[in-house]
């Protein structure tokens, strides 16, 4: 039994589900949803703290993310059976018919949207209450980056992401890659180290701040270009059909090919 969602009634608080569904059909996917979608962004310590107080805001916000993501993860397997005859489904006349592929896809998309939006709100809550969750801070100490948070990505980088911390976290590896590869090619190692030290210690001079602002603007817009490029997106999600898409207002469009005209 999972301590966060110990029964179907708990799950029903955040998703629409039939009470007759055996809890054993859902249980394996709860831990998977935690490990895949939630733990990387809030850490094991924060999840353990939610276990301790089921009446806390932390638990309620975590449940609103975990419920939809659990149901999304198991929806493809729910209703099918694995046995000697292979993969089969129940075929009982007079009972409810299986939903069409279109409806299943639409339901999964909505569950993903709800779960990820709830996860974004959960992360925002933790960021706003860091003093109450010191282990969350320890578990999420990032490596040095010129863009330190979602607000800087939007305000200084001039790319609209709805101030989404989750969007920023999703794009963080790409930002770092561009920083370590492109920025280091644009400026000398000495200048890079000086800017890094100044930014880390909040001792930037006005001239240094101008250069840092330009770097942030480049990193934000180049990252957004990569994430909104149709070709990049097609390559990125080829092996994963369910993936959170960062909130970015379109700023880039692949050139249109007219060869087929």
Q: What is each model feature region?
A:
Residues 26-34, 165-203:
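Hydrophobic/aromatic interaction determinants used to assemble and anchor large protein complexes
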Residues 126-165:
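Low-complexity intrinsically disordered segments
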Residues 1-22, 141-156:
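Short, intrinsically disordered N-terminal pre-domain segments
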Residues 11-47:
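N-terminal ordered "arm"
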Residues 259-260:
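Conserved small/polar residues in nucleotide/adenosyl-binding loops
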Residues 38-63, 72-76, 80, 204, ...:
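N-terminal assembly/attachment segments of tailed bacteriophage virion structural proteins
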Residues 57-91, 217-228:
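Elongated alpha-helical scaffolds
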Residues 76-93, 229-253:
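Extended intrinsically disordered, low-complexity coil regions enriched in Ser, Thr, Gly, Ala
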């Amino acid at each position: 039994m999972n301590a966060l969602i110990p029964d179907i009634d708990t799950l029903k608080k955040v998703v629409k589900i039939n009470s007759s569904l055996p809890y054993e059909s859902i249980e394996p996917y709860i831990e998977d949803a935690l490990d895949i979608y939630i733990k990387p962004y809030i850490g094991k310590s924060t999840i353990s703290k939610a276990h301790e107080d089921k009446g806390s805001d932390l638990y309620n916000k975590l449940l609103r993310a975990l419920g939809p993501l659990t149901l999304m993860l198991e929806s493809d397997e729910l209703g099918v059976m694995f046995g000697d005859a292979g993969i089969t489904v129940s075929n009982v006349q007079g009972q409810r018919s299986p939903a069409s592929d279109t409806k299943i896809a639409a339901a999964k998309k909505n569950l993903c949207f709800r779960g990820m939006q709830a996860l974004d709100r959960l992360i925002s809550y933790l960021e706003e209450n860091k003093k109450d969750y010191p282990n969350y801070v320890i578990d999420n100490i990032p490596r040095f980056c010129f863009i330190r948070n979602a607000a800087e990505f939007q305000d200084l980088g001039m790319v609209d992401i709805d101030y989404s911390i989750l969007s920023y976290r999703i794009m963080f590896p790409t930002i770092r890659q561009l920083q370590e590869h492109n920025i280091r090619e644009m400026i000398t190692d000495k200048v890079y180290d000086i800017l890094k030290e100044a930014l880390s210690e909040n001792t930037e001079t006005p001239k240094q701040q101008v250069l840092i602002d330009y770097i942030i603007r480049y990193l934000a817009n180049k990252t957004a270009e990569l994430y909104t490029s149709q070709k990049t997106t097609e390559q990125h999600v080829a092996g994963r059909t369910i993936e959170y898409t960062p909130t970015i207002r379109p700023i880039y469009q692949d050139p249109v090919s007219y060869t087929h005209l």
